[in-house]
């Protein structure tokens, strides 16, 4: 994947976490990404150059190049093809389509597993470039994807996970992030893109006069969202970026965690927030209920309902921390990696 070792978003964190756990268990694991090598990794890492997606934010949307991520992935392929030696591997895995999937499935390649980190439409759509999708195994990150695809592909239902050794309850560290010491903090951890529905979050927080909305992330809508917040919640909005090592402290510094994506394939951020003992507020959707269980504050899709859920969640933070971290423990990466190991082994044996 192009983003490996360069950005720490959901899919990249998932692949690195799985690779680390599998390597720790004795498997030989190779990751190929565009970022620099990191000291102390338990897997083998090969760097293949790409052009950062931010350079493509103003480029046109075309078939095969539907957004800045598609352009970035295409720029990654020459380096990937140079680094990739099919004979050295028993199985390959990606969540990137089309370019990386096609490159890893070239003639003579080992069995290939596709993970629905970014959605399952490559697996079921017969339109445009999706008609050329293929894999020997499909890992579905939620039950909806699994039910839709299990008759067509060898499939497994395996969610994403969380490192419960790092993400755990603890004291707030607001000063570390330049956040106000007084008042309540609503945190979002999100790319600044349309599907994350940050404008809806801004409008909900506007109904909570003493709350500040903090959005950790980046993306093409950063300026547009800042301008909206200045009009709707002046003085009560922060945009920031934080390295992966600081994310547990950031979650602990919030009174509630808010995530309003309607079509996320999983949402690592839900289990990260719960593991830190921070109450979760989200839209009431089957996929969200499957992740948070009875521990989430789920609302219908109106600003008033979201604000009411935030109010309730922030009032229960201390009392709920134990139950939240207990729920998150069900998604520990060690257990998730065992499921990956079992499925990858079956794919190799049956292909």
Where are these regions (language model features)?
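A charged, aromatic-enriched C-terminal amphipathic alpha-helix characteristic of glycosyltransferases
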Residues: 10, 318-347
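Carbohydrate-associated surface elements
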Residues: 144, 161
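Conserved donor-binding/catalytic core segment of Leloir-type glycosyltransferases
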Residues: 179-196, 202-205, 214
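Nucleotide-activated donor-binding/catalytic signature segment of Leloir-type glycosyltransferases, i.e.
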Residues: 226-242
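Aromatic "clamp/platform" in nucleotide-sugar-dependent glycosyltransferases that forms part
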Residues: 243, 262
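Short alpha-helical donor nucleotide-sugar binding micro-motif in glycosyltransferases
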Residues: 249-254
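Short hydrophobic beta-strand element within catalytic cores of glycosyltransferases
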Residues: 279-282
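Conserved acidic donor-binding segment of nucleotide-sugar-dependent glycosyltransferases
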Residues: 294-304, 311-317
């Amino acid at each position: 994947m192009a983003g490996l070792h360069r950005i720490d978003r959901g899919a990249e964190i998932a692949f690195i976490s799985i690779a680390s756990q599998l390597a720790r268990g004795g498997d030989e694991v190779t990751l190929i990404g565009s970022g620099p090598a990191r000291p102390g990794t338990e897997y083998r890492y090969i760097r293949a150059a790409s052009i950062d997606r931010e350079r493509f934010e103003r480029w046109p949307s075309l078939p095969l190049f539907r957004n800045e991520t598609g352009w970035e992935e295409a720029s990654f392929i020459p380096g990937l093809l140079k680094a990739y030696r099919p004979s050295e591997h028993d199985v390959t895995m990606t969540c990137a389509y089309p370019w990386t999937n096609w490159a890893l499935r070239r003639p003579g390649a080992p069995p290939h597993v596709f993970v629905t980190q970014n959605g399952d439409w490559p697996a079921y759509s017969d339109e445009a470039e999706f008609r050329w999708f293929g894999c020997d195994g499909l890992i579905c990150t939620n039950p909806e994807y699994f039910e839709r695809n299990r008759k067509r592909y060898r499939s497994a239902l395996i969610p994403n996970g969380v490192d419960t050794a790092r993400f755990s309850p603890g004291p707030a560290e607001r000063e570390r992030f330049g956040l106000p010491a007084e008042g309540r903090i609503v945190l979002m951890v999100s790319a600044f893109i349309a599907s994350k529905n940050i404008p809806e979050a801004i409008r909900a927080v506007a109904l909570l006069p003493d709350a500040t909305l903090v959005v950790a992330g980046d993306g093409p809508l950063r300026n547009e969202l800042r301008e909206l917040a200045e009009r709707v919640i002046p003085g009560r909005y922060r945009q920031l970026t934080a390295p992966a090592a600081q994310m547990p402290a950031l979650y602990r510094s919030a009174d509630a965690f808010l995530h309003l994506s309607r079509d996320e394939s999983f949402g690592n951020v839900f289990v990260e927030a719960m593991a830190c003992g921070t109450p979760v507020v989200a839209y009431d959707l089957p996929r969200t209920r499957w992740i948070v269980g009875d521990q989430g504050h789920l609302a219908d899709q109106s600003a008033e309902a979201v604000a009411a859920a935030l109010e309730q969640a922030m009032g229960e933070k201390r009392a709920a921390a134990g139950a939240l971290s207990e729920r998150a423990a069900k998604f520990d990466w060690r257990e998730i990696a065992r499921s990956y190991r079992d499925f990858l082994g079956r794919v190799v044996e049956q292909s």
